[in-house]
A protein has these predicted regions:
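Alpha-helical transmembrane segments and their immediate juxtamembrane cytosolic regions
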Residues: 1-367
Length: 367
């Protein structure tokens, strides 16, 4: 998820992921008051993760050192992502089909598909498969899967089927010819309208309905097309400013995920606007801007790889105090949970940078 020296940065992907971050704040802030099915933050976030992952797989193909890299960091995200589950839902540390667990498993699937297909476009063309599996499997299966490893494949929450489809669609839309984006948008829009008309109700996000799938694919396509449009105007000061406004959170998305919980918990203002829609718009922008400022400071700190061992020590020490029941103040755990989560995000990025740099040096020496 985080950038590394090898992965490079595709600006339009960072911009689109930044848009997903903005939608994430809106989704968690508004809850069910205005949009019962949330926003399309997760599909867009997942699609951008699929793009970045496939690009890095292509760039590091042939370097055996990166084979371990591509296995280790999804596993680290899978288990370390339990800190996000605690922050979002409370309770103790546990491994469930959560947001980061879905990302980790999907990255491993992309790694496998990247080994099977030399060209990434056929990988992207598989995006309907997870959705079809989800729609064809009986809902009753989820009850028997609950509490077992199979729940990560199918069930409540961010199960691999159907959410893997958005990672694959990200690869698809990345390789789709730019000049043919309008016919694709028209086809998705027509299909989404038809699905909404047939459904006759609110699209279901979890136990995903066909209407939600098509609307989400349309939203991802529109966001990425807009991101490309913004990038295309990078010679103008306004376009560059807008690009950086979204790209900064996009290239620091893991830290943003944890940071936005902190702001939602402690920085939300009272509703003093005459209409809730105004409150939603301005509060979302205010929280996003607050995240942006903090991420600007963080982006400088993450370049300091000398912080790796102090961050490891602090994460382990704080985690031991929290989960060992050794904290004295009763109100401390929520704040400490946030601190441990943000430290994990920082540690994850530092480790990736360190590991990628070492792999690159090994490749240069071998060459």
């Amino acid at each position: 998820m985080a950038g590394t020296p090898t992965s490079g940065r595709i600006v339009e992907i960072d911009i689109a992921k930044g848009m997903a971050c903005l939608l994430m704040i809106a989704a968690h802030f508004v809850s069910a008051r205005l949009i019962p099915f949330g926003t399309f933050a997760a599909p867009l976030f997942f699609a951008c993760s699929g793009m970045n992952t496939m690009l890095m797989l292509e760039k590091t193909r042939g370097n055996r050192c990166f084979d371990f890299f591509h296995l280790f960091f999804p596993l680290l995200l899978f288990f370390g992502g339990s800190t996000q589950v605690v922050i979002a839902h409370g309770g103790g540390l546990r491994i469930v089909p959560g947001f980061l667990q879905c990302i980790a498993l999907s990255l491993l699937v992309l790694l496998l598909l990247g080994r099977v297909f030399r060209n990434s476009f056929p990988v992207g063309c598989l995006f309907p498969v997870p959705f079809l599996i989800h729609l064809l499997l009986p809902v009753s299966l989820s009850a028997s899967f609950r509490g077992t490893p199979l729940a990560f494949l199918y069930g409540k929450g961010f199960a691999l089927f159907p959410w893997l489809g958005f990672f694959l669609f990200g690869v698809f839309i990345l390789r789709w010819p730019r000049q043919r984006i309008l016919p694709l948008l028209a086809a998705l829009g027509t299909a989404a309208v038809a699905a909404l008309a047939l459904a006759g109700g609110v699209p279901r996000k979890f136990w995903m309905s066909p209407a939600y799938i098509l609307l989400a694919l349309l939203a991802v396509s529109l966001a990425f097309a807009l991101a490309r449009r913004i990038t295309g105007g990078a010679d103008r000061a306004v376009s560059r400013g807008v690009a950086e406004f979204f790209a900064l959170p996009g290239r620091n998305a893991l830290m943003f995920l944890y940071l936005h919980y902190f702001l939602l918990r402690y920085f939300v203002s009272v509703d003093f606007f005459p209409h809730f829609c105004l409150y939603l718009i301005f509060e979302t922008l205010y929280l996003f801007c607050a995240c942006w400022v903090l991420l600007r400071l963080y982006e400088k700190a993450k370049l300091e790889t000398t912080l790796l061992f102090p961050v490891i020590f602090l994460t382990l020490a704080l985690g031991t105090l929290r989960w060992g029941g050794l904290l004295k103040p009763k109100g401390a755990p929520p704040m400490v949970d946030l601190a441990v989560g943000m430290l994990f995000a920082f540690l994850y990025v530092l480790l990736r940078r360190k590991f990628a740099s070492r792999c690159e040096r090994g490749m240069a020496a071998a060459g």
